[in-house]
């Protein structure tokens, strides 16, 4: 009996493209390979109620005390500046009340030319924040290439794109 197409038979059609070639038609225009190129889209977390209950900013591993209302005003001004320059602004809407650092999105993901790497912060204070970034990326349709797992730790702010071919 001849194989059906589903099992490699005569009507089987093998992909001849690489993932990067599939991006525009399948996933959309996602990907970053530069720290200084034109910014088209950004993922942010507006400082929320998770900042209101912080009493000890050092224990929260923040470098200085934060005034939540001032942080919100500054965030809103930044988001508006992005929009005024044609940048699409998306948000991580959810987090937990005990995760005030979630607003530092750059730590929680790294965009590559082919999609996102969801990181795994080294600090127990930050543990679990990456889930909310992964949810937001999935809702936006951004391909998630990898999630740092096992005993690995990594933060997106630890990387700087120098050359897309490196």
Label each region the model flagged.
Residues 1-166:
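The feature marks the mature, well-folded catalytic cores of soluble enzymes
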């Amino acid at each position: 009996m001849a194989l059906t197409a589903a099992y490699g038979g005569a009507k089987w059609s093998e992909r001849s493209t690489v993932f990067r070639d599939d991006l525009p038609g399948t996933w959309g225009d996602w990907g970053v390979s530069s720290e200084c190129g034109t910014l088209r889209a950004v993922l942010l977390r507006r400082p929320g109620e998770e900042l209101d209950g912080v009493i000890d900013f050092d224990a929260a591993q923040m470098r200085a005390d934060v005034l939540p209302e001032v942080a919100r005003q500054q965030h809103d001004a930044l988001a508006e500046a992005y929009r005024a320059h044609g940048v699409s602004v998306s948000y991580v809407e959810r987090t937990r009340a005990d995760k005030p650092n979630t607003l530092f999105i750059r730590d929680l993901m790294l965009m590559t030319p082919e999609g996102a790497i969801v990181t795994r912060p080294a600090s127990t204070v930050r543990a679990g924040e990456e889930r909310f970034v992964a949810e937001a990326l999935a809702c936006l349709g951004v391909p998630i290439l990898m999630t740092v797992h096992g005993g690995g730790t990594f933060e997106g702010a630890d990387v700087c794109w120098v050359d897309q071919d490196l």
